[in-house]
Amino acid sequence: MRVVLIVLDSVGIGEMPDAHLYGDEGSNTIVNTAKAVSGLHLPNMAKLGLGNLDDIPGVEPVKPAEGIYGKMMEKSPGKDTTTGHWEIAGVILKKPFDLFPEGFPKELIEEFERRTGRKVIGNKPASGTEIIKELGPIHEKTGALIVYTSADSVFQIAAKKEIVPLEELYRYCEIARELLNEMGYKVARVIARPFTGEWPNYVRTPERKDFSLEPEGKTLLDVLTENGIPVYGVGKIADIFAGRGVTENYKTKDNNDGIDKTISLMKEKNHDCLIFTNLVDFDTKYGHRNDPVSYAKALEEFDARLPEIMHNLNEDDVLFITADHGCDPTTPSTDHSREMVPLLGYGGRLKKDVYVGIRETFADLGQTIADIFGVPPLENGTSFKNLIWE
């Protein structure tokens, strides 16, 4: 038996009760995107029950639905990829990751400069493409490292490959990771951001590398691998979990590549396993850029390929589709939004047309997957296997 878990990065379905604390009242990524384009065409997710979850223009409610459906609330504080995925896997954060809207503290930057032997420029929240355009020439002249953050808990280091060789950049990231941990700053990811080319047409290269914080507790991935059930990550799963509990990981170029790799794993791995896929384009390419038209198109492209995924399920396999947070492209904010996420499930062993309600935590999904595999339970979450199992 295989479980295929697909996270549509940032595809939220309505504000959380505490959204006002995050400045996210009124956010509803799916519904507002559908309104912006006068209706979404998502017939395959509609069949599973997506239209039963909210009033989504173009996505009709279907009775009886072919799948199980519900929504999940986020119990952890925060609204980012790491927090969302950890919670799906059973780890609930007590305190949120640190954010640096004013840049990093002076003593941290000074110590980082001392340990790397290079000066730091930037030190502010910025768009990666904009900051290299702004500071690239100074970096080329002086060899100073471009350090910046975003609305997420990240410490990013950009450097031109011809000025700072890749291995050296990665070493600086390791220094930053150690230093943040030592000084007690809870930063989710340190990210190497190499670029090349000439000003003003610098291009970021694909050798981006994440140096993530390890999950604060045992995840579903740890429990599965400890019990002999491999976990195959597609996309940035290994980065999110700092490699822990991931048997093999397959990096992706874009959503379609992620779907291709998921399908080829389904064809290839005929043993008990979890195939855990993150499709990130919704978030990085369209949500943050407030581009509802392209966001809608990406949702429709995923939906059009859903039958291929379903066609490759064996009789006892289970497919779950969910998200990790919101990123409403129709609101003035370019940041993530604090939202509930949709949950759809399908498989030969699952009942049809079951509404699993609004779950109190994303961890209910991880707990259910642990229950399906018959491994020891996770620390958090309530399994709903009894509601959905034939």
Curated annotation (Swiss-Prot):
Q: Which Gene3D superfamilies match?
A: Alkaline Phosphatase, subunit A, Phosphopentomutase
Tell me which Gene Ontology terms the entry assigns under biological process: 2-deoxyribose 1-phosphate catabolic process; 5-phosphoribose 1-diphosphate biosynthetic process; metabolic compound salvage; nucleotide metabolic process
Q: How is the cofactor bound?
A: Binds 2 manganese ions.
The entry marks the following residues as binding Mn(2+) 1, namely D9, D324, H325
Any matching Pfam family: Metalloenzyme
State if Isomerase is listed as a keyword: yes
Q: In which pathway does it act?
A: Carbohydrate degradation; 2-deoxy-D-ribose 1-phosphate degradation; D-glyceraldehyde 3-phosphate and acetaldehyde from 2-deoxy-alpha-D-ribose 1-phosphate: step 1/2
**GO cellular component labels:** cytosol
Q: Which key words are in the record? A: Cytoplasm, Isomerase, Manganese, Metal-binding
| UniProt keyword Endoplasmic reticulum present | no
**Location of this chain's protein in the cell:** Cytoplasm
Question: Which chemical reaction does it catalyze?
Answer: 2-deoxy-alpha-D-ribose 1-phosphate = 2-deoxy-D-ribose 5-phosphate; alpha-D-ribose 1-phosphate = D-ribose 5-phosphate
Cofactors = Mn(2+)
InterPro entries per record: Alkaline_phosphatase_core_sf, DeoB, Metalloenzyme, Phosphopentomutase_DeoB_cap_sf
Superkingdom of this protein's organism: Bacteria
For this UniProt entry, what is the primary localization, expressed as one broad class?
cytoplasm
EC number of this enzyme? 5.4.2.7
Coiled coil start-end:
none
Gene Ontology terms for molecular function:
magnesium ion binding; manganese ion binding; phosphopentomutase activity
Q: Which family does it belong to?
A: Belongs to the phosphopentomutase family.
User: Its function?
Assistant: Isomerase that catalyzes the conversion of deoxy-ribose 1-phosphate (dRib-1-P) and ribose 1-phosphate (Rib-1-P) to deoxy-ribose 5-phosphate (dRib-5-P) and ribose 5-phosphate (Rib-5-P), respectively.
Q: What is this protein called?
A: Phosphopentomutase
